[in-house]
Amino acid sequence: MVIYLDVLIFENSIVNTFLLYITAQTLRIKVKMRYLILAGIFGGLYVIVLVIPTLKIFSSLIFKIIAAFLMIIICFRKKSLRFNIKALAVLIMYSMVTAGLCFFIELNNTRGSYFNAFIGNVSYKWILIAIMIIYMFVNRIIWFINDRKLTQSLIYEIEICFKDNSKFINAFLDTGNELREPITNLPVIVVEKDMVSGIKWDDCPKFYVPFRLFNGKAGNLEAFKPSYVKIYIGDKVEVRNAIIALIDNKLSSLNDYNALLSRGSI
């Protein structure tokens, strides 16, 4: 029997990527595709130990579990041992279900059977791999469309008003953002610095707003208080007092918005 190692690695990489993908969906964890694919390729390369006799020692159950655990680490990049063990259990469960499905198909894939007549000369493995690829591709498209709809529904046009002029900016309502300036207790609107580069705000009251990110990083944002801020919500216009904090980074990779509204702004 001739075994093409490159084809075997490719097939197993796709299957492992799919299993990790549905594991992430089950755990409701967002993962970056590059880490997902990298973990799938790592799992695909592990098949080498099954076909090379000198590496047979690494094909035992304990090494298979270690390889699966490393796939979890590469894919999810979580430090929590409890989460990684939970993810490993889900991955093993889906692997067993997939193996059982393949065994069932192979058992019923006999000459003259209805299943054999249905797929003809096409290998059932390639049909399953095609289904896995289509599922991941379509699911990502649906997720992207829904995410875009949600993002657009939370974008509002705001007008930052000064004594002599004003600036219109698209702002995203960050429902998890409760940032307030500690002295005035006013809500903070984070704005890209470039968006107010042409505005003379030197005469406005200056502040430094402390912040802390989820990764533990802390610091202070340079901020000022405009005359007022208008928030356009459908046909209504809300006038608010707020602090404008400036940030150097881009807030949207697609440039959908250039500011973040705190929950207390609306």
From Swiss-Prot:
GO cellular component: plasma membrane
Membrane topology: Multi-pass membrane protein
EC number annotated for this UniProt entry: 3.4.23.-
One of the GO BP terms on file: proteolysis
Family in the record: Belongs to the peptidase U4 family.
Transmembrane segments: 36-52, 60-76, 89-105, 126-142
Active-site residues, as the UniProt record annotates them: 174
InterPro entries in the cross-refs: SpoIIGA
Protein name per UniProt: Probable sporulation sigma-E factor-processing peptidase
Biological role: Probable aspartic protease that is responsible for the proteolytic cleavage of the RNA polymerase sigma E factor (SigE/spoIIGB) to yield the active peptide in the mother cell during sporulation. Responds to a signal from the forespore that is triggered by the extracellular signal protein SpoIIR.
Pfam families in alphabetical order: Peptidase_U4 (PF03419)
GO molecular function: aspartic-type endopeptidase activity
Domain of life: Bacteria
Lineage of the organism: Bacteria, Bacillati, Bacillota, Clostridia, Eubacteriales
Keyword Ribosomal protein set for record: no
